[in-house]
């Protein structure tokens, strides 16, 4: 038996070795904070010395273009001219986005985690190795997780809900969330819901959100547009140049070269729906158009369909029990399509019939939404090489619920670009 002193000494040694890693991490963190504070002090000292020195505006812009995005976010507070250059000047924002596109693409996406609350987003950048399992902290989700839809356009993410009257724009670069105002005189109900689509007009440099409100009881449909960055931020009601029977479905749309593409269905009455159509919305002119598609694309045997941007071309993927078909619109003016059909072998853990997206390299990927104690997995299928790969990301959640509603919402972006524009 150990004496009291020996047991106390052994316990002290145990605590020492147990706490050493924590102490080291704490000291490293404090050291990095001190280094950051020192750099900021040096920069402020440099600014004070340069108060009376006049630098040409073009030279300032060129210097700022060389800085990393994280530094640019800090330097917004230097002065109003700097803030305007970094966040509002179009040529500067475009140059940062172009620089981001020139960087070698990552095999793994940037993950956007959403708590099913429009004001609660957080981002995990995937610069890690595929062989590792990086840990991320995931907050428990709320009910109606599948009522949210996400659309990514030029560094921005639009999160909307067909159940709730709310729309949020999120910029992962600036970590800024912008909840849009509610549409006037609109009360959502089981018989009245809305679908939103996000687009960009490169001619006028405007980001717009299109909302289509459908009332299945009154058999009416109204159209509303919100333009980001205007002095009077509010929804505008527009006149839709399409039949009121054509209503949008709950699937996410895609914006390519100033045109939003989405899927619509022809309504026969309050309960029954007919054939499917591909529709487009020109972001600049705010007009709707029909898109000519192959008849087999809307086969009743297809259970899942999804739209995507494939190297600047509109793509549509559909699946049935045996096959998956990829359709690519090779010519937007003539609306000519090409097709690749392939069968999928059974792959443990990955259901590629549940389409999540496609990488710039042409890999189809499917994501599983984990429960509180399961890792997040991304499954990839290379169409050309007919090969699979699986990426697992460990997640830590608050283990307070064990219901299916605890599934988190994860949005993966493979062609992410940094956008310094302030919302």
From Swiss-Prot:
Any one Pfam family match given in the protein's UniProt record, by short name: FBA_3
Ranges of residues in domain F-box: 49-95
Signal peptide bounds: none
InterPro entries: F-box-assoc_dom_typ3, F-box-assoc_interact_dom, F-box-like_dom_sf, F-box_dom, Gal_Oxase/kelch_b-propeller
Classification via SUPFAM superfamilies: F-box domain, Galactose oxidase, central domain
PROSITE patterns: FBOX
PANTHER family in the cross-refs: BNAA05G37150D PROTEIN-RELATED, F-BOX DOMAIN-CONTAINING PROTEIN
NCBIfam families per the UniProt record, alphabetical: F_box_assoc_1
Protein name, as recorded: F-box protein At1g52495
Naturally occurring in which organism (per UniProt): Arabidopsis thaliana
């Amino acid at each position: 038996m150990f004496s009291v002193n020996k047991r106390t000494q052994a316990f002290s040694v145990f605590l020492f070795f147990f706490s050493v890693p924590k102490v080291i991490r704490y000291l490293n963190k404090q050291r990095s904070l001190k280094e950051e504070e020192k750099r900021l002090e040096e920069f402020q000292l440099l600014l004070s010395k340069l108060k009376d020195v006049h630098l040409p505006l073009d030279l300032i812009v060129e210097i700022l273009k060389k800085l990393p995005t994280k530094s640019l976010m800090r330097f917004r507070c230097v002065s109003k001219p700097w803030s305007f250059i970094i966040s509002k000047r179009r040529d500067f924002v475009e140059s940062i986005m172009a620089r981001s596109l020139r960087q070698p693409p990552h095999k793994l996406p940037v993950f956007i985690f959403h708590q099913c609350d429009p004001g609660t987003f957080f981002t995990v950048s995937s610069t890690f190795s595929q062989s590792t399992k990086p840990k991320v902290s995931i907050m428990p989700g709320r009910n109606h997780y599948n009522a949210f839809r996400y659309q990514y356009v030029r560094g921005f993410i639009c999160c909307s809900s067909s159940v709730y009257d709310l729309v949020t724009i999120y910029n992962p670069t600036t970590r800024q969330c912008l909840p849009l105002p509610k549409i006037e005189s609109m009360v959502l109900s089981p018989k009245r819901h809305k679908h939103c689509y996000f687009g960009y007009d490169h001619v006028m440099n405007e980001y717009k959100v299109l909302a289509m409100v459908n009332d299945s009881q009154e058999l009416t449909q109204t159209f509303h547009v919100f333009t980001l960055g205007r002095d009077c931020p509010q929804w505008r009601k527009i006149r839709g140049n399409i039949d009121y029977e054509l209503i949008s479905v709950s699937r996410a749309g895609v914006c390519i070269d100033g045109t939003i593409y989405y899927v619509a269905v022809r309504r026969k009455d309050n309960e029954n729906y007919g054939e499917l159509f591909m529709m487009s919305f020109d972001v600049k002119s705010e007009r709707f158009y029909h898109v000519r598609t192959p008849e087999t694309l809307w086969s009743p045997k297809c259970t899942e369909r999804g739209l995507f941007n494939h190297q600047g071309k509109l793509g549509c993927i559909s699946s049935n029990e045996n096959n998956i078909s990829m359709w690519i619109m090779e010519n937007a003016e003539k609306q000519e399509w090409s097709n690749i059909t392939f069968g999928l072998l059974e792959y443990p853990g990955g259901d590629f019939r549940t389409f999540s997206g496609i990488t710039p390299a042409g890999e189809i990927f499917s994501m599983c939404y984990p429960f509180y104690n399961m890792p997040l997995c991304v499954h990839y299928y290379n169409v050309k090489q007919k090969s699979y790969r699986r990426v697992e990301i460990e997640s830590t959640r608050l283990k307070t619920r064990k219901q299916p509603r605890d599934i988190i919402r994860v949005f993966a972006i493979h062609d992410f670009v940094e956008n310094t524009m302030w919302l």
